[in-house]
Regions:
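Single conserved hydrophobic/aromatic residue that forms the stacking wall/gate
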Residues: 1-13
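A short alpha->loop->secondary-structure connector
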Residues: 11, 29-40
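Conserved beta-strand signature within the Rossmann-like core of class I S-adenosyl-L-methionine
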Residues: 11-23
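Residue-level signature of catalytic and energy-coupling elements of molecular machines
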Residues: 18, 69, 137
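Residues that scaffold the ATP/ADP-binding catalytic core of kinase and kinase-like folds
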Residues: 24-25, 144
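Short aromatic-enriched loop/helix-cap "lid" or pocket-rim segments at secondary-structure transitions
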Residues: 25-29, 62-63
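Substrate-binding/catalytic lobe of Class I Rossmann-like enzymes that use SAM or dcSAM, i.e.
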Residues: 39-112
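C-terminal lobe and adjacent flexible extensions of AdoMet/dcAdoMet transferase-like proteins
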Residues: 73, 91-149
């Protein structure tokens, strides 16, 4: 996130990373690789794997494949959020305990959001109280954050 958030970068940024990391940067909700990294990258940039680099291309050969990922920075974030810092705290809390519901993972995270406030926000959004962070889109995390500000 720090690389993408950095204001000194140009509009397009390319970096070679482990293939697993590149996959996590570009995946969406409901997939096993979706998490805080996916959301952070997708808040600041449009990620796209442009080249897969097999481990056999390196000497000595590493144990993992690599990928070149292209990050095209957004001029403005794709979602309107009142407090980025709060949104990312909620996102991190949601994925710290992946298999727990949002009520339990965020409500017990110590970030200052009560289960009651979270219940009200989720109900306002029309989401079930049993929802997990891995099911929410970036837009839904922004909306949730805005309701909890």
């Amino acid at each position: 996130r720090d690389d993408v958030e950095s204001r000194g970068l140009g509009d397009v940024y390319k970096r070679q990373v482990q293939k697993e990391v590149a996959d996590r940067m570009q995946c969406g909700p409901g997939t096993k690789d979706y998490g805080a990294l996916s959301l952070a990258v997708q808040f600041y940039a449009r990620p796209k794997v442009v080249l897969n680099v097999p481990a056999s291309c390196f000497m000595p050969r590493p144990n993992v494949d690599s990928a070149v990922i292209r990050l095209e920075r957004f001029k403005t974030p794709p979602v309107d959020v009142k407090n980025e810092h709060l949104m990312f705290k909620i996102i991190r809390a949601s994925f710290n305990q992946r298999r727990k519901t949002m009520l339990n993972s965020v409500g017990n995270s110590g970030i200052g959001i009560t289960k009651e406030a979270l219940t009200n926000a989720l109900e306002t959004m029309g989401l079930p109280l049993t929802i997990r962070g891995e099911a929410l889109t970036l837009e839904q995390f922004a909306q949730l954050s805005n309701l909890l500000c």
